[in-house]
C-alpha cells in the first residue's frame, strides 16, 4: 500500500521531470556531436555547463536582456570548447586530458564569474524565459513548451549546418580522419569547430537550467557527461530502429534525456536514496554501453561452417 501511495504522487512530479529532461536534452545533443559525430571523448562539458549557468545569471543580475544573457552563455561555451580543441590539436594533448584540463580551469573561472559558490535569481524581479514556478501552468510560457520550441529550432539549425559542405567535412573528420586528410580536409580545424559548437550547446543548456531552477551553482555541471551519455545511449537503444534521419537521431537523444529523468523521478518517488543517484546513473550508462558488446558476443547467430566453406570455394 505504501508503494501505491508513493506512485500516486508521481503524476504531479512528471511535468518537472519532463522539463528537466528537455533542458538536459540540449546538453545531450552537444554530447552527441562529440561522442558520435566527432568520435572524441570530451569531458569539458562538466565545466562548460556550469559556465553557461554562471554567465547567464550574472548577465541577468547586471540588467541584461534574457536573450542577450543566453547569447553570452552560448559564446562562453563556444570559447570553452575552442580552448579544449586548441589543447588537443595545436598542443597535442589527448582529447580526454584536454577536456579534463579545461574542466578543471572552468571551476575556478566559474567561481570568479559569480564571485561566490552560487548566485540566485528571482523570477519576480527578473524577466526569465523559463521558471520552475510555471511548469504546471497551461500557458505558452510553460517551460516544457518553451524548451520544445528552443530544441526544435536548434535541431533544425544543426540539421541544416551538417548538410552544408563544412558540416559534411566535420562528419567526415569523425568518421575517417585519415581519408579526410587525404581529401584535403583540415581535420584539426574541424575538431576545434566541433568541440566549440558542442560546448556552446552545453553552456546554453546550463543557462536555461539556471533560469529554470532560479540559481547558478559552481558544481551544477558535475556529472553532466554521465547524464549526457545516458541520454544518448538510451535514445539510441530505444529509437535507433525507428529514427534513421540525422535530425530524428537528435530528437531521440532529447527523448532519451526525458526518459532518463522520468526514471530518476520514479526511483525517487519509490523512496530510493537520493545520495546514490550518481551511482545509479553510472550503472545505467555502463549497462547500456555493454549491451551492444553482449549482443555481438553472446547472442549473435553462429555462422555455419558449410556457408564459410562455400564462400571460400
Q: What do the PLM-derived regions correspond to, one by one?
A:
Residues 34-52, 87-101, 166-169, 193, ...:
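Short, non-helical or kinked segments that cap or interrupt transmembrane helices
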Residues 95, 99, 103-163, 193, ...:
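Transmembrane helix-bundle core of multi-pass membrane transporters
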Residues 64-104, 109, 152, 255-256, ...:
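Alpha-helical transmembrane segments within multi-pass membrane transporters and channels
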Residues 202, 206-278:
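Transmembrane alpha-helical segments in multi-pass inner-membrane proteins
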Residues 175-182, 186-189, 248-251, 263-313:
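Cytosolic-side transmembrane-helix boundaries in multi-pass membrane proteins
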Residues 35-90, 136-140, 242, 269:
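Membrane-embedded helix boundary and interhelical linker motif in transport proteins
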Residues 1-27, 55, 63-68, 140-141:
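Membrane-interfacial amphipathic/re-entrant helices at transmembrane-helix boundaries
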Residues 80, 140-225:
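Helix-loop-helix "hairpin" substructures at the membrane interface of multi-pass membrane proteins
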Amino acid at each position: 500500500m505504501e508503494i501505491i501511495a508513493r506512485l500516486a504522487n508521481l503524476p504531479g512530479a512528471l511535468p518537472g521531470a519532463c522539463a528537466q529532461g528537455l533542458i538536459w536534452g540540449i546538453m545531450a545533443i552537444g554530447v552527441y556531436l562529440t561522442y558520435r559525430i566527432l568520435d572524441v571523448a570530451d569531458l569539458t562539458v562538466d565545466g562548460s555547463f556550469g559556465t553557461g549557468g554562471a554567465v547567464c545569471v550574472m548577465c541577468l543580475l547586471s540588467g541584461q536582456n534574457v536573450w542577450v544573457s543566453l547569447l553570452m552563455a552560448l559564446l562562453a561555451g563556444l570559447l570553452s570548447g575552442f580552448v579544449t580543441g586548441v589543447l588537443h590539436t595545436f598542443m597535442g594533448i589527448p582529447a580526454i586530458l584536454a577536456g579534463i584540463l579545461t574542466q578543471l580551469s572552468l571551476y575556478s573561472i566559474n567561481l570568479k564569474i559569480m564571485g561566490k559558490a552560487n548566485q540566485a535569481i528571482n523570477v519576480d524581479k527578473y524577466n526569465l524565459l523559463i521558471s520552475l514556478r510555471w511548469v504546471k501552468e497551461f500557458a505558452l510560457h510553460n517551460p516544457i513548451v518553451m524548451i520544445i520550441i528552443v530544441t526544435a529550432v536548434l535541431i533544425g539549425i544543426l540539421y541544416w549546418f551538417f548538410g552544408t559542405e563544412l558540416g559534411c567535412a566535420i562528419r567526415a573528420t569523425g568518421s575517417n580522419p585519415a581519408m579526410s586528410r587525404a581529401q584535403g580536409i583540415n581535420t584539426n580545424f574541424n575538431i576545434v569547430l566541433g568541440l566549440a559548437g558542442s560546448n556552446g550547446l552545453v553552456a546554453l543548456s546550463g543557462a536555461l537550467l539556471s533560469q529554470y531552477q532560479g540559481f547558478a551553482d559552481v558544481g551544477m555541471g558535475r556529472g553532466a557527461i554521465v547524464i549526457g551519455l545516458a541520454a544518448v545511449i538510451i535514445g539510441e537503444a530505444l529509437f535507433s530502429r525507428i529514427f534513421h534521419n540525422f535530425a530524428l537521431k537528435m530528437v531521440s537523444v532529447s527523448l532519451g534525456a526525458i526518459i532518463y529523468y522520468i526514471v530518476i523521478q520514479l526511483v525517487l518517488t519509490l523512496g530510493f536514496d537520493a545520495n546514490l543517484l550518481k551511482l545509479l546513473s553510472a550503472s545505467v550508462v555502463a549497462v547500456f554501453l555493454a549491451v551492444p558488446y553482449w549482443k555481438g558476443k553472446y547472442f549473435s547467430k553462429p555462422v555455419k561452417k558449410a556457408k564459410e566453406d562455400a564462400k571460400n570455394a
